[in-house]
Amino acid sequence: MSKTPIQLSDHFTCRKLICFTLPSITMIIFTAIYGVVDGFFVSNYAGKTPFAAVNLIIPVLLILGSVGFMFGTGGGALIAKTMGQGDHQRANNIFSLIVYASAACGVVLAALGFLILRPAAVLMGAEGELLEQALIYGRINLIALPFYVLQYEFQCLFATAEKPRLGLFVTVAAGVANMVLDALFVGVFSWGAAGAAAATAISQCIGGVAPLVYFARPNSSLLRLGKCRMDLRALGKTCSNGSSEFMSNVSMSLVSMLYNVQLMKYAGEDGISAYGVLMYVSMVFQAIFVGYSVGVAPIESYHLGAENHRELRGLLRRSLGLLAVCAACMFAAGQVLAAPLSRLYVGYDPGLFEMTSHAFGIFSFSFLFSGFAIYGSSFFTALNDGLTSAIIAFLRTLVFQVGAVLTFPLLWKLDGIWLSIVAAEVMAVITTAIFLLAKRMR
């Protein structure tokens, strides 16, 4: 890495892009590992039913927490653009405003979560022990929801503040705490789903509070948390900018709930457990795409504000090349690791292992395509074009995935559910390419 600090105003080669975005990529991976570690310990130390319960209720928690990603991506794009225009005072005002607004939203959403948790679990078909385990896991996590929202938000804003390495440090600290506490609460104390939830909640508190302390004190970053004046226009622009990421996260969670309903119909609890393994691995693999998109977004927004369109075109071209290489590597890894990763989670049950390994082999084809749609949506957000970004996110999840998961099983039964994920990503890439070409022609 270069000894000279990388700045948003720099010219970015592929090497410099990797250097700048690597902390964001690692940061998002560690966040994804929270769920992966929970799943590993619950599955191997508590059994299939608690594991299925965790997988069943996680989409509800992700929907509530995704407001943090909306504020982080939407606000980060607006802050970076404002700094590119040279107005650092207004950039700091917007930064403080969105942090306070997101914290307030987190409190309100946590209260809402306690009201809807049981009805949502019942709606997805949970009953008996499956229902009780899901409620235990969900309620404990809801206590920490405001901190989860802040953690999600700061993952984006650290890059905007030109402090991606500090963001990585905070996320790694929270992730390590989660792993250690999971081993203690679930592996040693045998607290099951409750222990996994407590470990996650504590780690989210670490990830949310540490950035607050840093930005509230004098620091060497571009941003400082302090008093702010209400700016409804900036708040509205933040929400509209980040609406695509919010919609994408909410839609993916709703789609996961629909997948769970379909899997209960075609394969029962084993189907949900197999899908859970796929989602855990997918979160880590796709975290590379999400992390890159989060890391490069403030660069794109800055050069948009500075009206450096030549650099913007270069960033897009180099990003697509890097994503293509990464997609091929992840597909190859998915094919090779299908059996070992399935065995890691469900090796104790031969039937479930066979189902999961088979599903993984089909599902890994989605890695060839998913990164381009993720980046495409983020690219338009960085350009402050929230509408196009939202359309891509909406089509990718609520149209393509819902349509595929409802129709494909009619033709191919259980395999149709796994194939539907791949088909949806292919259609999303085609849609993204159309929007990018249209933007280039304009």
Regions found by a protein language model. Give the residues of each.
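Short alpha-helical transmembrane segments in multi-pass integral membrane proteins
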Residues: M1-T21, I79-A144, V188-S243, E300-S366, ...
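N-terminal transmembrane alpha-helices
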Residues: S9-A46, P59-G74, L78, A103-A110, ...
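Transmembrane helical elements of multi-pass membrane transporters/channels
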Residues: C19-D38, I140, A174, S203-G207, ...
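Hydrophobic alpha-helical transmembrane segments in multi-pass membrane proteins
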Residues: S24-A32, F69, A101-A110, A144-V149, ...
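Helix-terminus/linker motif at the lipid-water interface of multi-pass membrane proteins
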Residues: I33-F51, A121-G128, L184-W191, S253-V284, ...
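Small-residue-rich hydrophobic transmembrane alpha-helices
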Residues: F51-A111, Y148-G167, A274-A338, S370-I392
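Hydrophobic transmembrane alpha-helices of multi-pass small-molecule transporters
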Residues: I63, N178-A183, G208-L212, M283-A287, ...
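Short runs within selected transmembrane alpha-helices of multi-pass transporters and secretion channels
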Residues: G72, I140-A159, V170-N178, A196-V209, ...
